[in-house]
Amino acid sequence: MSAYLSNYWVLYRKYVELFDKLRYKGIPLGLISNFYQYISPELRVMMEEEPELFGSVDQHIDEGQIQPFFEERIQNIVKTNDEPVKGKVILHFDYLRFSNENYYQFDPEKTAVLARWSLPHYCDLPVISKREIADSCQKGDSKQYLETACSLLAPYDDHPAFGDQAFRDRLFKDIPLFIEAIDTVDALFEQEKISAVIVGTAEDIYSRVLALMCQRKGAVSICLQHGALMGDEAFIPVFTTYQAVFGAYEAEWFIRKGCKPEQILVTGHPRFDQIFNRTPMDMSIFYRKLAFQPTKKIVLIATQPFSEDFYSGVLQGLSDQKQLQIIIKPHPWEIGKNKLDLYHEAAKKHQACRVIKKELELYDLLPYVDAAVTQTSTVGLEAMLFQKPVLIGKSSGNRSYPYYESLGDFMFDQPDELAHTLVEVLRSPDVHQKAEEARLAFIAANYPVAESTNALFAELKAKTGVDYRREDTE
């Protein structure tokens, strides 16, 4: 474990212990904080450089004790002893990342979409507006909780984290939001008979409150895996009854962090189902939109922020490959920040290179490319599910992200080596076959479920006794 993460878990544990008795409607407010967002860039540097910033090594948390520490506190939430009901499943819209087709497969009589906005229906499912419930429900006063938080932090004025004004400001800003979310979700459970809740992440306030309220009310909660598992803070601890994952890599990772095997469900993610059943864009339209030639090979490069040197090296390595046509798909963060100069410069130098922001969807591109390049993005997985060879660049930085390491010879430290091998994959049948074998082995282990929505329905029925599938979609 890195110095930063060792410090992080010691600090997080101390925070949860300090705020354990600050509870509203039985829920500890300290568990709702998305804690890593409280850590300033300056404090992060200190945590990386000073391994014992928050205590000696003997105070560090063993990797396998991370989830048990939080699980004990989650299980200690006092239950309301409500009788189990065969009620609805609530789909929390934020971060769920379902396709429309995913929503249409749920039974409207047994399902509701919980969203920030207000509409009568979404994909034929009734919508429950968080804002409307929040406006109409009885509201708690956050003032006393803010005062208690201030008094709890008062002895820590000189503490590197708890004494940091930015840390305190973020917490004090969040506490009224915690109270509102608890009131809203509590009112939701009073309004509806709920057997299960599905969330797309446990990072945001409402998803976490939904999970903790399910624990209090005796309902089932499932958190889907929202992306490639590339960092502890966004995925652990698990707050839901069950954590759904893509495959074996994530299942083993969560178990190493102390999750119980029965807490992990290998379901894939419903949004990937469209890879197997979506009708692709017409081929002639694809080539016309990009002004590409059908006789030449196409490479997709899906970029990642803060990796300009790596992608620059790959593009430089391909600059003399006139037989290749290149699609650069920048990361959404790069598009939002307009960090695209490197890619536009590359497009000028290469006769057939296109920078695609939002003009075409990823799933319009992947059926027609011959290979894909990325680093830590789920695009690597998605391209492999589209049966394309994938080459992975190792990300820079002081953290290791081994998700794609089982690809072996098709994961690279150096961009020039990746570019060279990419050309060989497209030129040599033998090298292409090796890439295909690596792809097949990766998918067999790390995404074995081709029909994720069906797997999710099966798990929901097993856990609640209710079949939530829309009858006419069977």
UniProtKB/Swiss-Prot annotation:
Membrane-spanning ranges: none
Superkingdom to which the source organism belongs: Bacteria
What SUPFAM superfamilies does this protein map onto?
A: UDP-Glycosyltransferase/glycogen phosphorylase (SSF53756)
What InterPro entries does the annotation carry? Glycerophosphate_synth, TagF_C
Pathway note: Spore coat biogenesis; spore coat polysaccharide biosynthesis
Task: Write out the GO MF terms.
Answer: CDP-glycerol glycerophosphotransferase activity
The entry's cellular-component GO terms read: membrane
Q: Which Gene3D superfamilies does the entry mention?
A: 3.40.50.12580
User: What is the protein's name according to its record?
Assistant: Spore coat polysaccharide biosynthesis protein SpsB
Q: Which organism is it from?
A: Bacillus subtilis (strain 168)
* Phylogenetic classification of the source organism: Bacteria, Bacillati, Bacillota, Bacilli, Bacillales
